């Protein structure tokens, strides 16, 4: 097998632990959401996303209702673009004030640097907003890794479990699907990428998945427990 022309990676459960997102980022955004909306609700960018939330629930409602809705969506882990954008803005404040740094697995940081040094373009596709992705990599445990990434994609390119999203990404980066390796911990995402013609690898980390996924579940995807095990 020839080396891929590009590598596309997920974040949560792939480069980084699920627990960091669930136990640090989500609760931080939930706690900060009321004060953030009250303080910044008239800012055009914030209002744009709040209006999208109002459109989603189909009512002209006060901000307090929008705040409650957003907190409920956080609890439900909704992949709504407006929620992800607002979370990203809030996390930006947290990174800037050093309330936390983003978790990156050591093997992921090492391998991303090695691939970048070898001239393989790296791309990120996550349900988190592009600004949030950039902040995540810029303020990681391993330092500023944002310069390793050529481009970033979020759910504005499409849902992660639909093959059309991966075809759009391939078109945008100008690399044929079979020459792109997609890394994720979610089998349904890998299935969608494979239907779009991409190579795929399942990250099945014991820290995030104590019970290994079965061979039937993994199917034809390459399965690894760390980036160091990946075969290009």
From Swiss-Prot:
Signal peptide: none annotated. It comes from the Bacteria. GO terms for biological process: L-methionine salvage from methylthioadenosine. SUPFAM superfamilies: HAD-like. The keyword Metal-binding applies. Pathway: Amino-acid biosynthesis; L-methionine biosynthesis via salvage pathway; L-methionine from S-methyl-5-thio-alpha-D-ribose 1-phosphate: step 3/6; Amino-acid biosynthesis; L-methionine biosynthesis via salvage pathway; L-methionine from S-methyl-5-thio-alpha-D-ribose 1-phosphate: step 4/6. Keywords: Amino-acid biosynthesis, Hydrolase, Magnesium, Metal-binding, Methionine biosynthesis. It catalyses: 5-methylsulfanyl-2,3-dioxopentyl phosphate + H2O = 1,2-dihydroxy-5-(methylsulfanyl)pent-1-en-3-one + phosphate. Monomer. Bifunctional enzyme that catalyzes the enolization of 2,3-diketo-5-methylthiopentyl-1-phosphate (DK-MTP-1-P) into the intermediate 2-hydroxy-3-keto-5-methylthiopentenyl-1-phosphate (HK-MTPenyl-1-P), which is then dephosphorylated to form the acireductone 1,2-dihydroxy-3-keto-5-methylthiopentene (DHK-MTPene). HAMAP family: Salvage_MtnC. This is Enolase-phosphatase E1. It comes from Xanthomonas euvesicatoria pv. vesicatoria (strain 85-10).
């Amino acid at each position: 097998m020839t080396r891929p022309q590009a590598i596309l990676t997920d974040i949560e459960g792939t480069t980084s632990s699920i627990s960091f997102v669930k136990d640090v980022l989500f609760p931080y955004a939930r706690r900060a959401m009321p004060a953030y909306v009250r303080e910044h609700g008239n800012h055009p960018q914030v209002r744009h996303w709040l209006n999208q939330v109002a459109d989603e629930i189909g009512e002209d409602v006060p901000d307090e209702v929008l705040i409650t809705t957003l907190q409920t969506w956080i609890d439900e882990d909704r992949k709504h673009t407006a929620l992800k954008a607002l979370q990203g803005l809030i996390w930006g404040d947290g990174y800037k004030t050093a309330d936390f740094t983003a978790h990156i697995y050591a093997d992921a940081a090492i391998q991303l640097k090695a691939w970048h040094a070898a001239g393989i373009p790296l791309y990120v596709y996550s349900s988190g907003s592009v600004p949030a992705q950039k902040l995540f990599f810029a303020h990681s445990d391993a330092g500023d890794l944002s310069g390793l990434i050529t481009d970033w994609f979020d759910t504005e390119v499409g849902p992660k479990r639909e093959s059309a999203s991966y075809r759009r990404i391939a078109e945008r980066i100008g690399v044929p699907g079979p020459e792109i390796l997609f890394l994720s911990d979610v089998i349904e995402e890998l299935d969608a990428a494979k239907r779009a013609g991409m190579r795929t690898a399942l990250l099945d980390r014991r820290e995030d998945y104590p019970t290994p996924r079965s061979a039937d579940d993994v199917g034809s995807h390459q399965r690894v427990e760390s980036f160091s095990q990946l075969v290009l």
